[in-house]
Amino acid sequence: MPLKWKTSSPAIWKFPVPVLKTSRSTPLSPAYISLVEEEDQHMKLSLGGSEMGLSSHLQSSKAGPTRIFTSNTHSSVVLQGFDQLRLEGLLCDVTLMPGDTDDAFPVHRVMMASASDYFKAMFTGGMKEQDLMCIKLHGVSKVGLRKIIDFIYTAKLSLNMDNLQDTLEAASFLQILPVLDFCKVFLISGVTLDNCVEVGRIANTYNLTEVDKYVNSFVLKNFPALLSTGEFLKLPFERLAFVLSSNSLKHCTELELFKATCRWLRLEEPRMDFAAKLMKNIRFPLMTPQELINYVQTVDFMRTDNTCVNLLLEASNYQMMPYMQPVMQSDRTAIRSDTTHLVTLGGVLRQQLVVSKELRMYDEKAHEWKSLAPMDAPRYQHGIAVIGNFLYVVGGQSNYDTKGKTAVDTVFRFDPRYNKWMQVASLNEKRTFFHLSALKGYLYAVGGRNAAGELPTVECYNPRTNEWTYVAKMSEPHYGHAGTVYGGVMYISGGITHDTFQKELMCFDPDTDKWIQKAPMTTVRGLHCMCTVGERLYVIGGNHFRGTSDYDDVLSCEYYSPILDQWTPIAAMLRGQSDVGVAVFENKIYVVGGYSWNNRCMVEIVQKYDPDKDEWHKVFDLPESLGGIRACTLTVFPPEETTPSPSRESPLSAP
């Protein structure tokens, strides 16, 4: 069927060939020629004060100075000359005939061979056509052949939907790559809701990869609008399966996708063979139990097809075990989002020392912070960790207290798929100023302090049972320490023990339930941060006791090699930050907020460290100064503004 296009005017595509400004027969009078000196021994040639499109370059040789002249109009003159010879039937040495008619197109072999590898091989490779005066091109239509010949002789191509497919066929057959590129641009520039399916068909037929990718992107972006048109039902199975499996599909619920897929399947009986394959891409575990019972289980093939029955059982089991969901993740339980962001949580505000309960994500494209669902209660000095893209918030404090006397034991879990929080089992001990790591599907809360004092104990949370249990404790109580994981074990560095800053590094192996001492840091520090990039464990910032009655920022940073058991210094921070949030995003380390002891205030700064370049940069700020804040990366649904509906008409206009 013909594509619907907004304009019937053809698009005219041109190669950048200079336009001839002077007659070829016009004699050049020396009186009107002048050379204008330029830099680097270049000159422009002018005629009567007007630039002629000529340039020259001075070279030295044994024969003396040699000036090389270049005409910027020569190629245009030659091309126009050949085209005029063709139109007048002069010096043509071969006639081309399309496969669908007996029309004849006299051309010059040298022109065709210079523009096409196909013709070059035909006329120079010893093929039988090399000596023929008339050649029939089966597989090339009259319209397509005319377009190709016109382009070769003029560098211009006129395209519209009536001649597009003929032109594509000819360009593909004759290997005229510039024409193929123009056809791709023409198709991409004119995709609409009404023709996207047909454009996709053309892209697949002629193996136009760029066009096919663009159609996929267009359909994904506009799928909700496409569902309301008849074009949706014309989608081929492969493209529909791609869309349903994509994390980039937005603004559609799983129930809407299920109903739409059922419509597509029932349009034609043979399509029912695709039912199981398509239903594997519907995320049934993300539907509500009511939706599954009322709308899914009532569909006949969902009860009779073995694959579909198992999909329903999977969804039912998943929903029956909410605490286990982080360790039951699969493609069908994952959030439909393709954007991972830097996320911050809690902290104490610089003004009034009020504790925050805000959960925010940084939008890299918009260069701004956006709010997600806040916690039920404020938190700072808490621990956060991610399992299966679920964010756990553990312990901390709801009120500002530097001694940790108001530590809490409550634990909450954030589900970015629904932008909601739920409470899970509490810690066995209240703790703040501690470290929390996610390791092998478990959470480990290490040390800290509370109203009873400093803690050496370590607790492990099992999402499968929703319980916290004690594991091997540290040899000494620690608070204000930092930690990270690498190679299936957890590393804890620095911190404070009995009011003394430490530089030791300890390693906990959950398989043996033992702590092992490793090479100490080169600098004592506490309230610092730690993270893993590749095979390096980075220790950043923090503070230490000055020796009198005050503290200093630690600007120096270093990394630990578990393989070598040694530390290496790296570039120092630009500004001191203690009690911060830290996250690794796209192999860069982001240090967020915190407290600067040298400036005696909470800070809003976010600094980024590039391990490859060993460089620090200030990248952006928090909305407010926050100490005791925490950070991580999370795949979320960004809060989005309303986007305009896609056009049903082509935006194409002829240039």
Curated annotation (Swiss-Prot):
Residues 196-297 form the BACK domain. One of its GO terms (biological process) is cell division. Changing F223I: Found in a renal cell carcinoma sample; somatic mutation. One of its GO terms (cellular component) is cytosol. One of its GO terms (molecular function) is cullin family protein binding. Residues 92-161 form the BTB domain. Keywords: Cell cycle, Cell division, Kelch repeat, Mitosis, Repeat, Ubl conjugation pathway. InterPro entries: BACK, BTB-kelch_protein, BTB/POZ_dom, Kelch-typ_b-propeller, Kelch_1, SKP1/BTB/POZ_sf. Pathway: Protein modification; protein ubiquitination. Component of the BCR(KLHL9-KLHL13) E3 ubiquitin ligase complex, at least composed of CUL3, KLHL9, KLHL13 and RBX1. Interacts with AURKB. Substrate-specific adapter of a BCR (BTB-CUL3-RBX1) E3 ubiquitin-protein ligase complex required for mitotic progression and cytokinesis. The BCR(KLHL9-KLHL13) E3 ubiquitin ligase complex mediates the ubiquitination of AURKB and controls the dynamic behavior of AURKB on mitotic chromosomes and thereby coordinates faithful mitotic progression and completion of cytokinesis. This is Kelch-like protein 13. The lineage of its organism: Eukaryota, Metazoa, Chordata, Craniata, Vertebrata.
